[in-house]
Amino acid sequence: MLALGIEGTAHTLGIGIVSEDKVLANVFDTLTTEKGGIHPKEAAEHHARLMKPLLRKALSEAGVSLDDIDVIAFSQGPGLGPALRVVATAARALAVKYRKPIVGVNHCIAHVEITKMFGVKDPVGLYVSGGNTQVLALEGGRYRVFGETLDIGIGNAIDVFARELGLGFPGGPKVEKLAEKGEKYIELPYAVKGMDLSFSGLLTEAIRKYRSGKYRVEDLAYSFQETAFAALVEVTERAVAHTEKDEVVLVGGVAANNRLREMLRIMTEDRGIKFFVPPYDLCRDNGAMIAYTGLRMYKAGISFRLEETIVKQKFRTDEVEIVW
């Protein structure tokens, strides 16, 4: 069976085609701006403009036609309303024109589900991106969020800090490179509340210290990363202890950061459990994870009526009953 998935919750439009155990195509295009950030209207226009070219590219790479596709999947939320609506409209049009079943997929769940293509069974997932920071795991037939940011996503915090430093967007790789040259830890606010996190205080203080001119920028970047990532690892370890699961996966755009990977690897090795990070193109926002999750849902007997495909900007992970 083959599934086609369309992802477009934020600034990346991705289209993926997968079989039950293989990614046949995974193409994307990301809207970038000089100042960073995402304007919902601009994201929607970007997705609408590139939908047809990316669809053609995905079909060409996979060597299939739309007639060969068994199910159409799309990111139903959470995300930016205008961008989500472009994606849903395209998915509906394909489903109707080619008479295919359609499935709406929760974006956050898809980030964790794609790891199961690689043999992961039942993990605790640390999902870190621009807009989302969550620790989630399957419990009682649903993905439960055991901890999350109470204010801004870690990726957003890093990007704002990078913009303050004049590094441009996206800031993650540039902050990471600076941090590698850091020699001294500068104390910054560390906010963990149970299994929830807060990054706004850390960001504000890091910017204040930078503007004071008293600190090396490399040391600030190093300290920012160490503080934020230590908090992420702490709440992940608490979720592991609570759920007694023996696998941890790291997903989302910030999963590209080597220091975060290293800190999680140390924690999981200390606990004697498995740690997995998918290839980066399957960590970032992508259509393949939507296609794969949609295919698993469809095989379990799930398909949507068109009136059920309305987008959900605040689509919680625990709204979805996991029956696959």
From Swiss-Prot:
Subcellular location: Cytoplasm
Residues reported to bind Fe cation: H107, H111, Y127, D285
CC terms in the record's Gene Ontology section: cytoplasm; EKC/KEOPS complex
UniProt cross-references to SUPFAM superfamilies, sorted A to Z: Actin-like ATPase domain
Co-factor note (free text): Binds 1 Fe(2+) ion per subunit.
Cofactor: Fe(2+)
GO annotation, biological process: tRNA threonylcarbamoyladenosine modification
Residues where substrate binds: Y127, V128, S129, G130, G131, D159, G172, E176, N257
Main EC class the enzyme belongs to: transferase
Alphabetical list of CDD domains matching this protein: ASKHA_NBD_Kae1_arch_bac
Keyword check for Phosphoprotein: no
Pfam families, sorted: TsaD (PF00814)
Record-listed E.C. numbers: 2.3.1.234
InterPro entries the UniProt entry points to: ATPase_NBD, Gcp-like_dom, KAE1/TsaD, Kae1_archaea_euk, Peptidase_M22_CS
A molecular-function term among this protein's GO annotations: tRNA binding
Catalytic activity reported: L-threonylcarbamoyladenylate + adenosine(37) in tRNA = N(6)-L-threonylcarbamoyladenosine(37) in tRNA + AMP + H(+)
Main location: cytoplasm
The keyword Metal-binding is annotated on this UniProt entry: yes
Keywords recorded for this protein, A-Z: Acyltransferase, Cytoplasm, Iron, Metal-binding, Transferase, tRNA processing
Subunit and interaction comment: Monomer. Component of the KEOPS complex that consists of Kae1, Bud32, Cgi121 and Pcc1; the whole complex dimerizes.
Function: Required for the formation of a threonylcarbamoyl group on adenosine at position 37 (t(6)A37) in tRNAs that read codons beginning with adenine. Is a component of the KEOPS complex that is probably involved in the transfer of the threonylcarbamoyl moiety of threonylcarbamoyl-AMP (TC-AMP) to the N6 group of A37. Kae1 likely plays a direct catalytic role in this reaction, but requires other protein(s) of the complex to fulfill this activity. In vitro, binds tRNA, ssRNA, both single- and double-stranded DNA, and exhibits a low ATPase activity.
Leftover remarks: The ATP binding pocket identified in the crystal structure would actually engage the substrate TC-AMP.
Family: Belongs to the KAE1 / TsaD family.
The name this protein goes by in its record: tRNA N6-adenosine threonylcarbamoyltransferase
Organism the protein comes from: Pyrococcus abyssi (strain GE5 / Orsay)
